[in-house]
Amino acid sequence: MSYQDLKECKIITAFITPFHEDGSINFDAIPALIEHLLDHHTDGILLAGTTAESPTLTHDEELELFAAVQKIVNGRVPLIAGVGTNDTRDSIEFVKEVAEFGGFAAGLAIVPYYNKPSQEGMYQHFKAIADASDLPIIIYNIPGRVVVELTPETMLRLADHPNIIGVKECTSLANMAYLIEHKPEEFLVYTGEDGDAFHAMNLGADGVISVASHTNGDEMHEMFIAIAESDVKKAAAIQRKFIPKVNALFSYPSPAPVKAVLNYMGFEAGPTRLPLVPAPEEDAKRIIKVVVDGDYEATKATVTGVLRPDY
């Protein structure tokens, strides 16, 4: 799978990591989850990202996860590996290892967290990673998690690097519009905000890297088809019903809500690993009613005001 395959992807699912109650990875649960995603319009899969609880995964666990999912997917959709850290040297070594591992269309590298680099520091960080191997790199810009924000101007400098092929943008629609207007033609722009997918696609984004596609992929697919057919009225109607579901899925630190819904649907998503904890039982029930049944009144007390998936 290559850049060209990624270019065809509209819905890339940021895959959860299923766990047993003891916290170990439930590898037996992965096949059913993958087939569910592929049956419901997932075009690509991101592994070891935020939704996978990557801060709690060991290096060996990530490699085991990569191997397991590659075997199941067997080339049916492109795979992206989460490869970034806040240590440039460590990120370079991981990118090289993933490139040698093979089977990935790209690596997703997050903006460095905690150490709060300058724009020039971030530029040098991503340039060094992209220079290190031939694995194409997608930048993950999410200031809600990492505190600092890669500006559109710095992003466009990086977009000129031949091995930096895109961005997962979680800042603002204004930034996204600017990037889409000024980027190189082949540079991919994805939103990482499920709630912004309607607006992002209308602005000309390439797709969404999504959590909600675990549970609501059909709705997203239908909305994207309506947008492609210039049926804005239909797409907007889908979006109005979709937004409360997104709010519910991010009413507690992700991926706790989506795991609760998947467990209810019969998939063995399992618990989260500490320091993340499940949503309280009554709130989880209300989240499920919204996401599965479209009962929008059920979670009003839980999700009112939660408009952005900063979790």
Curated annotation (Swiss-Prot):
<dbReference type="InterPro" id="IPR002220">
    <property type="entry name" value="DapA-like"/>
</dbReference>
<dbReference type="GO" id="GO:0008840">
    <property type="term" value="F:4-hydroxy-tetrahydrodipicolinate synthase activity"/>
</dbReference>
<dbReference type="GO" id="GO:0005829">
    <property type="term" value="C:cytosol"/>
</dbReference>
<keyword id="KW-0704">Schiff base</keyword>
<dbReference type="Pfam" id="PF00701">
    <property type="entry name" value="DHDPS"/>
</dbReference>
<comment type="subunit">
    <text>Homotetramer; dimer of dimers.</text>
</comment>
<feature type="active site" description="Schiff-base intermediate with substrate">
    <location>
        <position position="168"/>
    </location>
</feature>
<feature type="binding site">
    <location>
        <position position="51"/>
    </location>
    <ligand>
        <name>pyruvate</name>
    </ligand>
</feature>
<keyword id="KW-0220">Diaminopimelate biosynthesis</keyword>
<comment type="function">
    <text>Catalyzes the condensation of (S)-aspartate-beta-semialdehyde [(S)-ASA] and pyruvate to 4-hydroxy-tetrahydrodipicolinate (HTPA).</text>
</comment>
<feature type="site" description="Part of a proton relay during catalysis">
    <location>
        <position position="114"/>
    </location>
</feature>
<feature type="site" description="Part of a proton relay during catalysis">
    <location>
        <position position="50"/>
    </location>
</feature>
<feature type="active site" description="Proton donor/acceptor">
    <location>
        <position position="140"/>
    </location>
</feature>
<keyword id="KW-0457">Lysine biosynthesis</keyword>
<dbReference type="InterPro" id="IPR005263">
    <property type="entry name" value="DapA"/>
</dbReference>
<comment type="pathway">
    <text>Amino-acid biosynthesis; L-lysine biosynthesis via DAP pathway; (S)-tetrahydrodipicolinate from L-aspartate: step 3/4.</text>
</comment>
<keyword id="KW-0456">Lyase</keyword>
<keyword id="KW-0963">Cytoplasm</keyword>
<feature type="binding site">
    <location>
        <position position="209"/>
    </location>
    <ligand>
        <name>pyruvate</name>
    </ligand>
</feature>
<dbReference type="GO" id="GO:0019877">
    <property type="term" value="P:diaminopimelate biosynthetic process"/>
</dbReference>
<dbReference type="InterPro" id="IPR020625">
    <property type="entry name" value="Schiff_base-form_aldolases_AS"/>
</dbReference>
<dbReference type="GO" id="GO:0009089">
    <property type="term" value="P:lysine biosynthetic process via diaminopimelate"/>
</dbReference>
<protein>
    <recommendedName>
        <fullName>4-hydroxy-tetrahydrodipicolinate synthase</fullName>
        <ecNumber>4.3.3.7</ecNumber>
    </recommendedName>
</protein>
<dbReference type="InterPro" id="IPR013785">
    <property type="entry name" value="Aldolase_TIM"/>
</dbReference>
<keyword id="KW-0028">Amino-acid biosynthesis</keyword>
<comment type="similarity">
    <text>Belongs to the DapA family.</text>
</comment>
